[in-house]
Amino acid sequence: MRIAIQGELGSFSHQATLQIEPEAILIPCALSPEVFRSVLSGEADAAVIPIENSLAGSVVEHFDLLFQSDVRIEREFSLRIRHNLIAAPGSKLEDIRQVLSHPVALAQCRRFFAAHPAMTPSPFYDTAGAVKHTIELGDRAVAAIAGEQAARAYNGLVLQAGIEDNPANFTRFFLLRRSAQVHQQPDADKVSIAFSVKNRPGTLVAALQVFADHHTNLCKIESRPVHGQPWEYIFYVDFQVADPAVPSAVLQQLKRQCLLVKELGYYPAARLLS
């Protein structure tokens, strides 16, 4: 299966993809919109995108692209994020002076930098890209922070593993397909939707009451601005159900009282990947 991912080979998206589809042919894309275009054009059969980190929060651009694109979520899964200090072969920990990585990864390793004041963190566009650049540079005073997949992809040396501040660091990923090609999972128990309501008192409360009336487990709600309409919002909701008849009942009732409703996916709730 051809799967599009955002970023360089060796990224956490790469690592997550191989854990669920070990034989996948990866299509790395520089930007997130390219990932979605790759799926919609048929260049890729599916895409794997990060949607939320347990520490840094949501990847808001991906919520917008989900809403705008004719794709649906087929699966979700979570990956434990382990950050590693990676350098060119022959490098030594005590010689490192500059450390490259994505700003989120750098922020999640503050204790490591506090313990190594001689190292200067430097933002880079991508964790795996930082490793690729470091290995190509060949400067033994430069290192990068990324997952172990990046070290394997670019023959980097792991100088220190597990340098993240918080071991309870997980990222949720979605496996997406074109809407017409999604395979419905028999054990689906989680639904993602987007909806908007009129900007007047009580409309959002009334919409949320629908979930309570059907005894769903509302596990996430997030708002995003409507592009071109200041102070208007789209609400993204994840909810879990025990009865397979509930999702359609919820959607039907929401459609009667909301301006718009879009189902983003009906899939099995995630299991944690180590």
Where are these regions (language model features)?
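Domain-level signature for soluble enzymes in the chorismate/prephenate branch of the shikimate pathway
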Residues: 1-274
